[in-house]
Amino acid sequence: MYNHKVVEKKWQKYWLENKTFKTGTDPEKPKYYVLDMFPYPSGKGLHVGHPEGYTATDIMARMKRAQGYNVLHPMGWDAFGLPAEQYALQTGNDPATFTDENIAHFKKQLQALGFSYDWDREIKTTDPNYYKWTQWIFEQMYKMGLAYEAEVPVNWSPDLGTVVANEEVIDGKTERGGYPVYRRKMRQWMLKITAYADRLLDDLDDLDWPEPIKEMQRNWIGRSVGAQVTFKIKDSDKSFAVFTTRPDTLFGCSYTVLAPENELVKEITSPEQKEAVDAYIKSIESKSDLERTDLNKDKTGVFTGAYAINPVNGEEVPVWISDYVLATYGTGAVIAVPAHDERDYAFATKFDLPIKEVVEGGDISKEAFAGDGVHVNSDFLNGLHNEEAKAKMVDWLTEKGVGEKKVNYKMRDWNFSRQRYWGEPIPVIHWEDGETTLVPEDELPLRLPKESNIKPSGTPESPLANLTDWVNVVDENGRKGKRETNTMPQWAGSSWYFLRYIDPHNDKALADPELLKKWMPVDLYIGGAEHATLHLLYARFWHKVLYDLGVVPTKEPFQKLYNQGLILKNHEKMSKSRGNVVNPDDVVDEYGADSLRTYEMFMGPLNASIDWDDNGPSGVKKFLDRVWRTFVNDLDLDPIPSEKITDKNDGKLDKIYNETVKTVTEHFEELRFNTAISQMMVFMNACQKVDKIPREYAEGFVKLMAPVAPHMMEEIWHVFGHDESVQFAAWPTYDASKLVESTVEMAVTVNGKKRGNFQIAKDASREEAQAAATALPHVKEFLEGKEIKKVIVVPNKIVNIVAK
């Protein structure tokens, strides 16, 4: 009887002790770098959702090794971040100790699932030897002018005591923990990701990534081409610029809108409107950008009492403020053409502002018309369609010096400051004379000091500000300075970790340039779709910076990306609060790691979200037990190969075996693991129907199944008399000539009635088919005493006999 508890521990110990999965370095072999999104080691440990992606990459790693590749398949820990700090605050524990305990637990769970990681390359972002290089990258960005300080409106979370990035705010609350977020201005470190906007956008075209992820990044970057136009304030020397993608509709502008935070608002508001304007500005303080720009929300706004002059026709148009205009997007001001823009139309209708048609084609008494049409009421644009009119208007604006063509981006620079303790220290010193300098490279890493009081200060300073011994510094000339007390966000360490796996113990460089050339880019990267505009965008940005520095040899880090779906329970996402989390440890204990791995790959397509079935692993275990019984006789103490295994081949399994090798190999390559496993089940069914199984086919099947259920397959391989791990056995190949049947079944009719079937070599001659048909005992009966008048043979199908 197969005992998974004994066998799985035995092989896990063997793999670890023998370093079976050490990264290959044979210069003659091609490389394959297969990567999981490394996990945040939370206190909860793994749930059954984690192993789905990990099993998929593990199958690929194991197959590629067997196919003769040097495989890099590493694992590490994204260990900085708010959850550990929140836990530490609530319990009084040290986040470092808590994190290391969690890592040990996670690692034990991963090893119990038999993943073929090269543990010699394990990294964690909280290791000073690792974040030395995170700090080094920051310093290079600073020198390139890509890291700068600015007073910016930020998403401040008082509960967390820190700022969170735009990407981390959902419906006015923090992505993690759901705490309320308020807008306020603070001094922040920013990374100039906008300098790379065009490259981040254009290079998406060359990547083998899911289209929805590419589309999310395109929308996030949000490149739009239009014009920037200057509007003067009536009776004033003040003016403001607006960006518009529809300069052709300027003749239809009936009002303008400024962001409430726009500096100009205070200067131009009339005394009569001041109270209303101030009250409105206060009312929107806690709204996030996403809430403010939601198309479905009710429009709000206030008139400033000021008027602007439309440069194309000299008309006076009222200046309003509204929260849907963001100070950080474009110029923080927009023109409103309600006849041809849905949002402007809703606003104008609500506040009874004029609606002027300048493009024919709709009914503006009912709704805005945003389509193409002939321009009217537009002076020199009359009679033109949209694109021609845009070009002509841009030329006119440029000629008159009141505007120009402009490309705009929705993406903002990346807010890189966090007012927390548990993050990488930013290696910067602010001196009393106003100078800011970097910590010298030879002094990196700037270590995070050990500290028990890590309570957020509730101010723009992090808890590090309380550590005066650490913060205060004096240079050799007696000049006093203070260290930067903000720390980096959790996204910093994960923006380059895939490079460190290539050379994890290098203390002279982030990684050896020759090794980077050998291994980059990552060939396959599997992880969740929820990181589309965070980690995946940030990592691409950092990689491009490192490419410009000559540190990395490729423009992009991840050639192929694949998103695994969610594993649901009762059609809901698993979470502790819902009480529907399935712990993999329990499944492994009862059914074995091989059963869990095989079930998760067999559930359905890898990229689909699928409901967990509690009976699933037991069903898969029955299949695996059948594999064991088919190949192994374990009636005595020492298991031996089953009596069915033979060195002879009678050809009965030729077609199904070669089909199985072909299908499994192709479907693994395409990440269609569920259909590959189905094919292996079909082969096992065929094995039940024959008396003998050729050893070559039994061993070939074990090699195919080993990436999915590695423990049992190692054991069977060992029973078959092999000393080395099945991982070192060459991947099976198929014989194309055996994919077609060598024999066919033909039917026989006598005088129009079916009288039997017979097997014969495919494409046998008419004479051979007739001889075989007339030799059948049942046919002989019906021909007795009769004369055969005619025989019609349809090759490979039927023999028709006419007899009298």
From Swiss-Prot:
The UniProt annotation puts motif 'HIGH' region at 39-50
Q: Which GO terms describe its molecular function?
A: aminoacyl-tRNA deacylase activity; ATP binding; leucine-tRNA ligase activity
Look at the named UniProt entry and state the broad enzyme category this protein falls under. ligase
The GO annotation for biological process reads:
leucyl-tRNA aminoacylation
Its domain of life reads: Bacteria
KW Transferase (keyword) present: no
Q: Which reaction is this enzyme known to catalyze?
A: tRNA(Leu) + L-leucine + ATP = L-leucyl-tRNA(Leu) + AMP + diphosphate
Motif placement: 'KMSKS' region? 573-577
Q: Which stretches are transmembrane?
A: none
The alphabetized UniProt keywords are:
Aminoacyl-tRNA synthetase, ATP-binding, Cytoplasm, Ligase, Nucleotide-binding, Protein biosynthesis
EC number(s) per UniProt? 6.1.1.4
Give me the Gene Ontology terms describing cellular component.
cytosol
Protein family according to the UniProt entry: Belongs to the class-I aminoacyl-tRNA synthetase family.
Cited HAMAP family: Leu_tRNA_synth_B (MF_00049_B)
Q: What is this protein called?
A: Leucine--tRNA ligase
- The source organism is Lactobacillus delbrueckii subsp. bulgaricus (strain ATCC BAA-365 / Lb-18)
Its ancestry begins with: Bacteria, Bacillati, Bacillota, Bacilli, Lactobacillales
